[in-house]
């Protein structure tokens, strides 16, 4: 949902009985972090002054100079389909506290891409940037890892693996390196992938 004003967002919150508003950011390693406030506290001041956070815990600043603010981006708002409490979630920008006004933190990923687009247009390279990330990952049933002075080990397992042929598979086990575009019933995660795709489409992410 693309909110253009805080009034539109507040109206949606009331109409849909949203109880919490969640703000998502990434740290220096690219991991999601979030700050959550009651929906009743989400107002014009939130958009103007932002939400304060300690940038040192994100890897963005030293402890002695770590005060930063998060400014929400209403155009990224969506209802969190996984939260048990009705929650509106959105991303935004990390800013360095400064006077007379705060300034964008130049290492924050969203600010990096904004500068890249600005440079692209100013230099005449192009007038539009299209980014198509590939959602590639593995699904495991169990992952174990251990690091000790005398030992480093990692163990993974999935029911689709060829080493599980003795686990009452009734002939449906995928052979070694034979799982590319495999069909049912060997493809055990079709429903999982389909649900992921539907959720992304609902959030405006077009899936090829």
Predicted feature locations:
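Glycine-rich, acidic/polar active-site loops that bind/position phosphate-bearing ligands
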Residues: 1-208
